[in-house]
Amino acid sequence: MFQAAGAAQATPSHEAKGSSGSSTVQRSKSFSLRAQVKETCAACQKTVYPMERLVADKLIFHNSCFCCKHCHTKLSLGSYAAMHGEFYCRPHFQQLFKSKGNYDEGFGRKQHKELWAHKEVDSGTKTA
C-alpha cells in the first residue's frame, strides 16, 4: 500500500497479507539474534564473560585465573613467561629454567642434543 523511501529501501522487507486482503510491509530488525559462542577459561574450564576475559598465548583466561604455576601470584600480560603451555612469573621462570640452561631438562624431557645423538647412532649402525 505504501512504499518506504530513501535509505529505508535497503532494509529487507517482507509482504504479508492481512485477513482483509490488504498487504502490509514489515521490516526485519537490523540486529541479529546470533547465538554467542561461550568461551571457557583454560585454567578452570568455566565460562569467561567479556569483562573478565584475558588472552595469553592464544589461550583464554579469567583475570583471576591467570597466575604463576609455581607461586600462584596473579600475572599480567606484561609480567609473565610461558613454557610448553604453562605460565610463570618472571622470577620463578628464571629460577626454574634459566639457571639450568636447558628448558627441556626442567620439564623432565630428553635434552634436544640427546635426540640428535640417538639419530646419529641409529644411522651409523644401519650403514655398517
Swiss-Prot record:
It is found in: Cytoplasm; Nucleus. Residues 1-25 are annotated as: Disordered. Residues 39-99 form the LIM zinc-binding domain. Zn(2+) 1 binds at residues 41, 44, 62, 65. PROSITE patterns: LIM_DOMAIN_1, LIM_DOMAIN_2. Pfam families: LIM (PF00412). SUPFAM superfamilies: Glucocorticoid receptor-like (DNA-binding domain). One of its GO terms (cellular component) is nucleoplasm. Signal peptide: none annotated. Zn(2+) 2 binds at residues 68, 71, 89, 92. It comes from the Eukaryota. Disulfide bonds: none annotated. One of its GO terms (molecular function) is metal ion binding. The modification N-acetylmethionine is found at residue 1. PANTHER family: OS06G0237300 PROTEIN. Interacts with ILK. This is LIM domain-containing protein 2. It comes from Mus musculus.
